[in-house]
């Protein structure tokens, strides 16, 4: 049994498990097993489930139970549109100002992602975080961390989509290649290249993702 003192702590655990797909879309969440798992009273679990529903992560159906929500592909597509536009602009601003030290940091982070992606047993949580860290580099360099955090926290469906993207077998070599193409564009200061490259990175695996989110 896991010991948690507050509903906020229990919420944080379940939110993370939904976003990292430990709890898949359509999975059932029952009050009794959650009470036993967290050593919490039913009233506290109900507060947690209600908050998860308010944030679009679960759906509570009276007398039937609670399930993890399916991905809303329309919302995901809009968030990808937003992410592509913002990140391409940040890259255009960053590229002419990129220092040798920043280029070296980007290379190290891209190499770290590639090493995780090519491991015999892939840790998808670490891989997802390595990808986030790489993209965070140019936002941080341009002093756009508020924008970065806003994009990361925009909607749970987007975070789940990105995790599903990361876990899509056969797609990691393409992601590594996309990273290298973005880095090459930074190094040659090819400002026109960023929007199509970022668009390709975020939209290319969609058919398999759509199937797996149903």
What are these regions (language model features)?
Residues 98-99, 170:
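Short coil/turn segments
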Residues 1-96:
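Short linear motifs at protein or domain termini
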Residues 212-214:
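Basic polycationic patches enriched in arginine
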Residues 202-209:
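Conserved small/polar residues in nucleotide/adenosyl-binding loops
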Residues 100-164, 175-188, 193-201:
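Conserved amphipathic alpha-helical segments that form helical-bundle/coiled-coil interaction surfaces
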Residues 58-59, 154-156, 171:
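Mobile beta-alpha loop/short-helix "lid" or hinge segments that flank ligand
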């Amino acid at each position: 049994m896991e010991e948690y003192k507050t509903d906020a702590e229990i919420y944080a655990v379940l939110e993370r498990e939904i976003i990292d797909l430990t709890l898949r879309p359509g999975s059932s969440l029952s009050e009794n097993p959650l009470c036993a798992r967290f050593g919490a009273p039913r009233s506290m679990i109900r507060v947690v489930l209600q908050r998860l529903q308010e944030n679009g992560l679960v759906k509570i159906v009276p007398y039937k139970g609670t399930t993890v929500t399916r991905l809303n592909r329309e919302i995901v597509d809009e968030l990808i549109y937003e992410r592509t536009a913002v990140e391409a602009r940040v890259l255009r601003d960053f590229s002419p100002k990129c220092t040798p030290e920043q280029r070296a940091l980007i290379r190290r982070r891209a190499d770290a992602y590639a090493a995780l992606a090519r491991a015999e047993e892939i840790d998808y949580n670490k891989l997802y975080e390595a990808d986030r860290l790489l993209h965070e580099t140019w936002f941080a360099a341009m002093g756009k961390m508020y924008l970065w955090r806003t994009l990361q926290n925009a909607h749970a469906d987007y975070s789940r989509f990105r995790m599903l993207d990361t876990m899509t077998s056969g797609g990691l070599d393409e992601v590594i290649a996309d990273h290298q193409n973005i880095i090459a564009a930074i190094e040659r200061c090819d400002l026109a290249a960023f929007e199509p490259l970022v668009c390709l990175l975020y939209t290319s695996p969609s058919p398999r993702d759509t199937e797996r989110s149903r």
